[in-house]
Amino acid sequence: MSVFQNATFYTTVNELRDLPPPVGVEIAFAGRSNAGKSSAINTLANRNRLAFVSKTPGRTQHLNFFRLGNDRFLVDLPGYGYAKVPAEVRQHWERLLGTYLQTRQSLHGMVLIMDARHPLTPLDRQMLAWFAPTKKAVHVLLTKSDKLTRQQGQKVLKTVLGFLRESYPQCSVQLFSSTSREGVKEAAALLDAWFGSGIEPDSGMIREAGAPESGKGNAPEPPNARNKKPPVKGE
């Protein structure tokens, strides 16, 4: 059974001082507002309302921690790209997200949610470039794949895979749909492996998704990546 089936809400964080102790394993979920991040979390956990789903962008306001048992945590980050945010709020989130994502010792990887109909937006690319210096794994979920034909889905997958292989070899990618459940089993198996649950993902899926072979996961640092700010609300 996937570790996601044990997910329960743990805590919400709006200040660095409120972060739980950095023990165990954390995987962060990030993505543009309304890309389907909350739906993906709920689908993986087989819950209807573990993460709040809204048609209104920007509803996730804090770092929401969900405990999966045995010091394993899923961390739901605020969606980026939502314009209706005051400057002071945006600056606060730049500090909070920047410090968390780049210095958190217990953070083992990030799941980056992209709408399969609109992948690799400028903010998505910014997030990839900004996170790359950590040398930590990134798995891209191309959500809402049910909105595409099979041919369209494969074309999008090929395009994103080509981009990642060239620039971010520590990344893997797959199609995903909370509606049709395409890719749910594969995503759960990969993330179970990240959590060290002993459940191994299908190796064929991982190679096709563009994950690096063992020992080849360190991406070159993009130019000026350390000087970039994380994409947050209002950008």
Swiss-Prot record:
Residues that coordinate or bind GTP: 31-38, 58-62, 76-79, 143-146, 176-178
One Pfam family hit: MMR_HSR1
Keywords: Cell cycle, Cell division, GTP-binding, Magnesium, Metal-binding, Nucleotide-binding, Septation
A GO molecular-function annotation: metal ion binding
Parts of the chain that traverse the membrane: none
Domain EngB-type G span(s) in chain numbering: 23-197
Superkingdom as given in the UniProt entry: Bacteria
GO CC terms, sorted: cytosol
GO terms of biological process kind: division septum assembly
Cofactor(s) needed for function: Mg(2+)
Residues spanning the signal sequence: none
Protein function: Necessary for normal cell division and for the maintenance of normal septation.
The name this protein goes by in its record: Probable GTP-binding protein EngB
Organism: Nitrosospira multiformis (strain ATCC 25196 / NCIMB 11849 / C 71)
Gene field: engB
